[in-house]
Amino acid sequence: HIPSPDNQLLAVSCMPPELTDGTYESHIYVLPMTGGEPKDLTGPGLSYLHGWSPDGKELAYCAFRKKPEEETMRIEICTIPSDGGEEICLTDGKGYNDGPEYSPDGKHIWFNSTRSGLMQVWRMNRDGSGLTQMTDFDANNWFGHVSPDGKHVIYLTFAKGELEPNEHLPNMYVSLGMMDYDGQNKKKVLDLFGGQGSINVNSWAPDSRRIAYVKYVLHHK
């Protein structure tokens, strides 16, 4: 769930309550922060919310889509107006695309994708142009989160070979990496036992000086 920039609305992705036949779907809804009737923006299919644009006009999400003439499911980065409207998929069907997040100035969308082989952090303009790979080392990198001051990006790294590139599981040794907004000065911040859930959402402090993360405690007998 993500609050709107003005804190008046709440966006969530969840299973529609009317599905009682065992079918699984995930729709994106918007409702008043104080409660009320939710508005279904995406309709049938699998849509997983990740970002709300700083101007409050759009939502960005990971969408599983398949046209009638297609044999396999596409995992795309899509956007939709926050008050409802046409879905626009910004990626081109290449690879597994996930984790879209707007930059603080709203000019870019950061996401991760296997389009180059391993999972890597990418950046594109808000309209889908200017696609740029931001990490390129021999590991699987997920969930690039931009600091509020727009200077740094934190991301989660899984070692190559331990998982398929499109997998991010819990209970694993992983690391947090950081780079400048332009992709320079990459460095490891720390190693931890965690994985899925460690930094799935942007958890930078408002002053950009610290970041919260989840690690798991190892119990030795």
Q: Model-found features: residue ranges?
A:
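Feature marks short, surface-exposed loop/turn motifs that line or immediately flank catalytic pockets
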Residues: 7, 18, 56, 67, ...
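Short loop/turn segments that connect beta-strands within beta-propeller blades
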Residues: 32-36, 81-85, 125-129, 180-184
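Conserved beta-propeller blade repeats
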Residues: 1-10, 44-59, 92-112, 138-156, ...
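CBM-like carbohydrate-recognition segments
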Residues: 181-184, 189, 198-204, 214
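A short beta-strand motif characteristic of beta-propeller blades
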Residues: 37-42, 86-91, 131-135, 187-191
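A flexible loop/linker signature enriched in serine peptidases of the S9 family
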Residues: 13-28, 42-47, 62-77, 91-97, ...
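Acidic, proline/glycine-rich low-complexity intrinsically disordered segments
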Residues: 1-18, 31-34, 38-39, 44, ...
